């Protein structure tokens, strides 16, 4: 099948939308990608091969799904919009290695669907053009899952991509940066102009790759508790770490003494702002807080 016939070709996309009387649903964050080169570049960035089974979220009319299916062993796509199921039945009919389930991925038992539709013998990847309004929940769901995902390559709002990949000292660096980079290596692969979507969104996008980290030299006992510490430290970005910790744990003399002990032991300047601390700094900070017995108010 050549590019002229591909779903992602602008002419064919319009024809499909007209045939089915479709219009993008803002409530579901739908924007249809109509640039074949961008679609191919996404699949290239994911390094999809016949050795891979791929999970996709929000296939839409199948533009990206098709390109993934040309290279992957099998594609398991989650589509929340029931009205698109008949469309996908037609547009993806030439391919026998695609399974589309009509489910909200945030409510679905993804592990069960993977077990039912994929053989578990191949590498597992997530490749998707994510709805902007649920990008972060979807990423957190897959990062926290027990699925052995080898790589994620996802399109998202450029602003969110910059936050995910920001480094200490960057203005975009925040709790999301720390929480994601605690588990994943992140990299912006390339930017995507709003011009290549129908309808055209108000913001540009970016393709981000995420690969699992092996771990850190020290680890927190409980991830969720660690994340609460991180979010708490960033609650007031303009405040230094000393003031933020007092806001979290209290200002009583004995509490302030414990906070001072924590910072002194770690060599952290009390006047530094949280966006200057590395992921490892936050892990050590959290662990030391636990040892000191500090409890959030």
UniProtKB/Swiss-Prot annotation:
Subcellular location as annotated: Cytoplasm
Enzyme Commission (EC) number: 2.1.1.182
GO CC annotations, alphabetized: cytosol
Keyword annotations from UniProtKB, A to Z: Cytoplasm, Methyltransferase, RNA-binding, rRNA processing, S-adenosyl-L-methionine, Transferase
GO molecular function, one term: 16S rRNA (adenine(1518)-N(6)/adenine(1519)-N(6))-dimethyltransferase activity
Entry annotated with the keyword NADP: no
Family per record: Belongs to the class I-like SAM-binding methyltransferase superfamily. rRNA adenine N(6)-methyltransferase family. RsmA subfamily.
Protein name: Ribosomal RNA small subunit methyltransferase A
Organism of derivation: Pediococcus pentosaceus (strain ATCC 25745 / CCUG 21536 / LMG 10740 / 183-1w)
């Amino acid at each position: 099948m050549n590019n002229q016939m591909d779903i992602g070709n602008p002419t064919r996309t319009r024809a499909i939308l007209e045939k089915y009387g479709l219009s993008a649903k803002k409530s579901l964050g739908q924007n249809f990608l109509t640039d074949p080169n961008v679609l191919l570049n996404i699949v290239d960035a994911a390094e999809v091969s016949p050795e891979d089974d791929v999970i996709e979220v929000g296939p839409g009319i199948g533009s990206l799904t098709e390109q993934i299916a040309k290279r992957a062993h099998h594609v398991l796509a989650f589509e929340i919009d029931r009205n698109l199921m008949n469309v996908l039945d037609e547009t993806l009919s030439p391919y026998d290695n695609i399974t589309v389930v009509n489910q909200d991925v945030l409510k679905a038992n993804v592990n069960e669907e993977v077990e039912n539709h994929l053989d578990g013998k191949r590498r597992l990847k997530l490749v998707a053009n994510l709805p902007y309004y649920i990008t972060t929940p979807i990423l957190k769901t897959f990062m926290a899952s027990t699925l052995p995902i080898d790589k994620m390559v996802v399109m998202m709002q450029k602003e969110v991509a910059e936050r995910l990949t920001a480094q200490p000292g960057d203005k975009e660096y925040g709790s999301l940066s720390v929480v994601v980079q605690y588990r994943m290596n992140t990299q912006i692969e390339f930017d995507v102009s709003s011009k290549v979507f129908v309808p055209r969104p108000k913001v540009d996008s970016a393709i981000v790759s995420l690969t699992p980290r092996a771990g850190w030299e020290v680890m927190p006992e409980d991830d969720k508790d660690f994340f609460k510490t991180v979010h708490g430290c960033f609650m007031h970005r303009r405040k230094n770490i000393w003031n933020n910790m007092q806001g979290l744990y209290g200002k009583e003399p004995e509490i302030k003494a414990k906070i001072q002990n924590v910072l002194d032991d770690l060599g952290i300047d009390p006047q530094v702002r949280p966006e200057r601390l590395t992921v490892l700094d936050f892990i050590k900070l959290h662990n030391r807080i636990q040892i000191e017995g500090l409890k959030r108010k």
